[in-house]
């Protein structure tokens, strides 16, 4: 009789421990990866943006080398986003949108916490200067002036 009672008690404790283990998510399940945290930051940028189109992750800088694995401590992030063809009012996820040809590119920096439940995002994004477009325009402009300089003697570029 004593053995049966101990057996029932052990069975109840085992059941309670099993239920408790299933009810409480593990700490590793609550931590986001660096990339997942950045994708959340991009989503937040799109939600708060007044831009006409959605932006999508273009390039992600490598995560900083840190020993601290605590998901509640802010981690620095740096990444670039590019304008897509999808309007901001669309319900389509930005990751499913194609990049817009000659779309704006923005550099984003800030901090994120990797906690999936209480994650905090503090990121700002600024438009990158379009150096490539300016160089192409300048070359075409110089070429045009070289063609016109014999016709108009006042126009001479060195």
From Swiss-Prot:
- One GO CC term of this entry? extracellular space
Q: What does the record give as the function of this protein?
A: Exerts a potent antimicrobial activity against Gram-negative and Gram-positive bacteria, including methicillin-resistant Staphylococcus aureus, and fungi.
Organism the protein comes from: Bos taurus (Bovine)
Annotated signal peptide: 1-29
Q: Which residues form the propeptide?
A: 30-131
Keyword check for Oxidoreductase = no
What's the main place this protein lives?
secreted
PROSITE patterns in UniProt: CATHELICIDINS_1, CATHELICIDINS_2
Covalent S-S links between cysteines: 86-97, 108-125
Biological process (GO) annotations? antimicrobial humoral immune response mediated by antimicrobial peptide; defense response to fungus; defense response to Gram-negative bacterium; defense response to Gram-positive bacterium; innate immune response; killing of cells of another organism
As for family, the record states: Belongs to the cathelicidin family.
What protein is this chain from? Cathelicidin-6
What subcellular locations does the record give?
Answer: Secreted
Going by the UniProt record, its keywords in alphabetical order are:
Antibiotic, Antimicrobial, Disulfide bond, Fungicide, Secreted, Signal
Give one GO term, molecular function aspect: lipopolysaccharide binding
Pfam families reported in the protein's UniProt record: Cathelicidins
Record-linked InterPro entries: Cathelicidin-like, Cathelicidin_CS, Cystatin_sf
């Amino acid at each position: 009789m004593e053995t049966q009672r101990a057996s029932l008690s052990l069975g109840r404790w085992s059941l309670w421990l099993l239920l408790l283990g299933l009810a409480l998510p593990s700490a590793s399940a609550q931590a986001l990866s660096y990339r997942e945290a950045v994708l959340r930051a991009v989503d937040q940028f799109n939600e708060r943006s007044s831009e006409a189109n959605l932006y999508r992750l273009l390039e992600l800088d490598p995560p900083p080398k840190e020993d601290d694995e605590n998901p509640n401590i802010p981690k620095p992030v740096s990444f670039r986003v590019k304008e897509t063809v999808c309007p901001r009012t669309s319900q389509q996820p930005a990751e499913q949108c194609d990049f817009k040809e000659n779309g704006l590119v923005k550099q984003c920096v800030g901090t994120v916490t990797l906690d999936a439940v209480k994650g905090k995002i503090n990121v700002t994004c600024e438009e990158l200067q379009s150096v490539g477009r300016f160089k192409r325009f300048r070359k075409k402009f110089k070429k045009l002036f070289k063609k016109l300089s014999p016709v108009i003697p006042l126009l001479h570029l060195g």
